[in-house]
């Protein structure tokens, strides 16, 4: 037994905590106590128990402090201490030493807050008194002077328990305390106990009342927070809907380059007036009624996913393992949200990143560390601290660029890009590493400058952390100036605004011809300077225009991204001189006329690809004058400078692969009929199967509306089949007459009958044969038959074979032949 105990102490029992360590030592101490309590036990067994119990208590304490530090408070069930106390009491009678162990346990908060510990201490004292004294009204007699002030030892234990303010069940201790004083103590002690209990009950009642009030206040605060969030969400939804209506236009109207549209103003940063209008009373009523429903929906929604703290790494899996097998393996340890598999470089094993629903499920799954998965011994480790939030990198960055940035030896497990459906200007990603050391090393790139103007941000991912938006627009440092004269450029605008603050950047909007649109965005150094610019320049006359200056408002709903290229060649002519108005008008009309030939839709683009990457894909095939990305529809509209370039680009881009998706080229109106694919990054949600192709879907894909299916259309077709013995005119054995007449066109040619075209033959136009013609044909056939018979007889005579027996002449009567021809037609 001792050898087994030593082998157990040398193993990693504390891998999953101290539970296994305490269980092992409790079993060992129980064995020592039973050996010592045996009536026939030797002195060696008793000495072994004395030393073994003390050594076990010290070993558990040292082991726990080494594992958890000062936070270790011992076994909540104090199993080793109880074995030690009963050993001292029953075997040695060392009551004072046993009480010292009880007092040490009472000093630990973990046990001092538990009423069951104090009841166990009380029962030990009562059993001890009953065993030491057989008679007497009171188990602890005392002088009369001490009866009114000093309670007995068991009562003092209960009184000491009632002094703990965080006792989990004080009512139970009060009940036993009053019962003990009523049964064993004097009247003075009982009266003092009742007074003490009365005061204590008042304190407990007030404490419970304060706790209830605090809970009620907390619940009301949460309700107000939910209500404010619901109001903000409804207001944001209304604003997004208004912006979406203004941004969404007729796709066909988008092809007219000469017409200004509101959604172009939104894409360039301008805020339409309708977005700043107050909602109507009906909208306010709807939004006011929304919080209750939103609050209920938020309560019913599951908790937010926390991939960073609910995932584990499972390594050394078989190379042919599947997601289903891994999910079945961990199913009994918790709910699995998602599983990602990646083959090792050697190709002999696979590593999996398993995401659970809660942190407790992930901790439970660690039990499988070192266990078998088939014939492989797997390793299960925590995946905390391996995911980094990376942002502010160049817009053209992709997976390959990130691998080069962090280095090939960075041990990257996967990269997760956000969806651009509702904000096409997002530029961040999540990078997961194989271990925490690699992630910590990658954070050293935080603050690195890329391409001379992008300051990289690399931080640990924390779903609970919220960061205020940065930038001139979100910080209130950007002003929007409208109605600027056409002859003003960016330098003149900067000189105008610099009188009221420090200008950081000026962005003047241009049209397709490169001319000013009379609108600009100016970034200043502080918010106060921006407000001063608005106060000083708003409604000021500049040249012949009245300026309109206001603070820029960022649009939260950005379902598309737009880029244009200034066509300088079309805007100027005659060696750099500006073209006359007549030339500009003719060029504009020509451009609008062939716009549909220069534009096309590129479909099948993933919703994680931004507009810069689409441009880098399409720009090698020619100069792009306009590009607009629609992540919600999974495509983009590309406009080239001429028809030839657009045609070559369509041939080159069709069937191109982009991140595992096959791109295809189609007309622009088809883009707005497409929907971007739904990404499901969970294994606990069944993926939708694509519908089977039917007649309705086929007609819909061809751009035609399918006719609605009605009940008569579902009936089987009625087929007429010929039946022997049916009624009708009996014809002869020859050819039957054609009942259906052939309809002819105006030029005399036959038309289609029953859907099949009837071809004109010589029999259609040839005259009909008479009886004389049939008679001549018959006689000609008979003469040819007689000549053949003579030739066969001559051959048989030459070969010596017997001649064939001639049959009697059965020449038909000519008159009968004529009758048959007239009646039967042959």
UniProtKB/Swiss-Prot annotation:
Function: Functions as a recycling factor of the spliceosome, a machinery that forms on each precursor-messenger RNA (pre-mRNA) and catalyzes the removal of introns. Chaperones the re-annealing of U4 and U6 snRNAs (small nuclear RNAs) released from previous rounds of splicing, an initial step in reforming the U4/U6-U5 tri-snRNP (small nuclear ribonucleoprotein) that can reassemble into another spliceosome complex; this step involves binding U6 and facilitating the unwinding of the U6 internal stem loop, followed by base-pairing of U6 to U4.
UniProt main location, coarse: nucleus
Organism: Ophiostoma ulmi
InterPro entries reported in the protein's UniProt record: Nucleotide-bd_a/b_plait_sf, Prp24_RRM1, Prp24_RRM2, RBD_domain_sf, RRM_dom, RRM_dom_euk, RRM_occluded
Transmembrane domains' residue ranges: none
SUPFAM superfamilies: RNA-binding domain, RBD
Stored SMART domains: RRM (SM00360), RRM_1 (SM00361)
Record's protein name: U4/U6 snRNA-associated-splicing factor PRP24
Organism superkingdom: Eukaryota
Localization (cell): Nucleus
Keywords: mRNA processing, mRNA splicing, Nucleus, Repeat, RNA-binding
RRM domain: residues covered: 310-385, 386-463, 477-554, 598-670
Gene Ontology molecular-function annotations: RNA binding
